[in-house]
Amino acid sequence: MPFTRILAVFVVVAAGLSGRIESASESASPARTDIEQQQAPSWSKDDLNFFLHGSMSTEVVPESVLRAFIKTYPDLFPSSDLSHLGLILDKDFGWPIGLSRKNVQHLGGMPAVGINCASCHVAQISSISRPQPIQILGVTGHFDVESFFGSVLVATFKTSDPENMKRFLRNYVSDTGKVHGDHAETAVSSAWKKQEEKIVAAMKTDPFGGKDVAPGELHKIEPAEVKLDIKSLEKGDVDLAARVHSMLKLFHNMRTTLHVPDKPPDKVPPASGPGRNDAFGLLSASLLNMPQPYSPIKFGLVWNVDKRIWVHWDGNTKSPIARNLLASLGLGAPMHGKRGDLIFADVKRQTDLSEKIAPPKYPFSLDNDAAKRGAPLFANNCNSCHGGPESDTRLHAVAEVGTDPHRAEMFTQKLADGFNKFLVELESEGYQAPKEYGVRSTGKYWAATLSGVWARSPYLHNGSVRTMHELLTSPDQRAKTFHRGSRVFDEKEMGYTDDGAYVLDTAGSGNSNSGHDYGTKLSENEKRDLIEYLKTL
């Protein structure tokens, strides 16, 4: 069925594949650090706040619904603050960095949350020598984005069961009415008992809320239809069966904006884990209805983007606004035919800000003598691919590099044509269709400039090599599995420590750690010198 592929990726959590991630320190709103100021010196405080929490029109779940889900399904949401997803807490905002808030009409006018660039491109790291977390912009983050959306979607399906709906409503009333849980439970249970037969019949007739609307279309939901307060329940002024049906329609709208059908999939693919997803696989399925083989990649790096012509691991996109429009429309901004329902100015502002982020300077101690010895090693082993002009000479065939071929092979010319056609036909207020195509297929991998390479762990496009020292090790001697989720930086090995709940198995589809054997024949001392030099870039 259409779009089953994208749903399958999102609901990996349903198969118990999601693991708890090491959480950040529970601080208030992060103060602007020296490293952030170095990375984005032209940003104002408002710019920083907008990058961290500004809307991209992806708000997909009402806050009150999300809080009720968190209380109702602790198996899906092990932490109430979402820290289990690898997000950075921000108590002043109320939700972690990378989450936005906006009132959404098709969600009953309620304040809802979605994600923006910062959810995937901001991270905190520490080390044994410097335990205080350092916040970095534009880096590969630790967010388990699949588990976030998977948990929300699975919760909508689970709440189509009457008993689960009753539990959900108790928590929903408790949150929206700001009343004690026991008080809400008594009120909901009493009202439910009076209308139970009617409620169950309504849920059986339309369990997923999509009966009265065409596939892919949204219900119009007025605020009063999803309002549920303790006083009205106790007075008997509420048609609870009607409220339940409105909630099911709300869940339908949530799924529809994520291009997910009102039916769970029969099977799911493997979980990509923190800091990774199958980005173009999701977008090709959701926006083009062109499902692709599973091809996990780590989140890209948003540094010096203004100096690049083509971006992404295969150099397939040259339009900055296009890539963020695709992300917004794939992750919650509604589509009505060819019209994208989003605030273009907000997406453009996020895009413009991301263009101004510089790579972070190495924040830990450095062996300058070793770095000097490493400079010629870099020139002889790395610079021929990773240096020089930003041109297509940076593209290298999979056979030449030897790394996992899935990502390069999946982005075909047919797929590029599909995205170009989509962007030309897209309508949205303020958006002007490109005069020339900005998406292409290369079938190769791009050798990016290595500025900030110290912070790019895990390495390779699919994040299959944990540290730089291991990347300089012969592929057949690299670890076959390692853990993801740690925020502790190993200064000696140059990468995150082998900790966290998620296990990356390099034998899995798209996860190969083969290839890129450059520098593997250096002596151990030479490797250490080269690593020290790389920290200076």
Where are these regions (language model features)?
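Signal peptide processing junction and immediate N-terminal pro/mature segment
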Residues: 17-27
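Bacterial N-terminal signal peptides
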Residues: 7-16
